[in-house]
A protein has these predicted regions:
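Histidine-centered active-site/metal-ligand motif
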Residues: 29, 82, 117
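Short, flexible turn/loop "capping" segments at secondary-structure junctions
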Residues: 1-6, 60-63
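Acidic/histidine-enriched, glycine/proline-rich intrinsically disordered or flexible terminal extensions
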Residues: 102-120
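Short amphipathic alpha-helical segments
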Residues: 18-51, 89-96
């Protein structure tokens, strides 16, 4: 389905008391993406997913939560456009995004990767 496309994926690990902020960040970013990104052509955003759930380590819940963002683009031009738009007309978050990130236990940011297998 998305084989040979480009993917951006971020993971934030945070304490449960930040869950409302995490949900608002996902909502605000999705709204901005809907207003600014195209569904067609070289820069097409093909898929946007946010997920939230407990963090597990060695099969056990850690007490932390995870927020995962996955964006799939037609090619690298879409990812490049995404970051350019973020700099030029960045998303308006209701919460201080930098403050949220500073309170996270861990953050993993993969700005671009090649999708090597995809189903349905």
């Amino acid at each position: 389905m998305f084989q040979n496309k480009k993917q951006l994926q971020y993971l934030w690990i945070f304490k449960p008391e930040l869950i409302d902020i995490a949900n608002r960040i996902a909502e605000d970013h999705t709204k901005w993406m809907n207003e600014t990104h195209t569904k067609e052509g070289d820069k097409a955003l093909l898929m946007l997913n946010w997920s939230i759930g407990p963090e597990f380590k060695d099969g056990n819940k850690t007490g932390n939560m995870s927020l995962i963002l996955t964006e799939v683009y037609e090619n690298q031009a879409g990812i490049d456009d995404h970051f350019q738009q973020a700099q030029n007309n960045g998303a308006a978050f209701r919460d201080d995004f930098s403050d949220f990130e500073s309170k996270c236990e861990n953050i993993v940011k993969i700005n671009t990767s090649d999708i090597i297998h995809s189903m349905w």
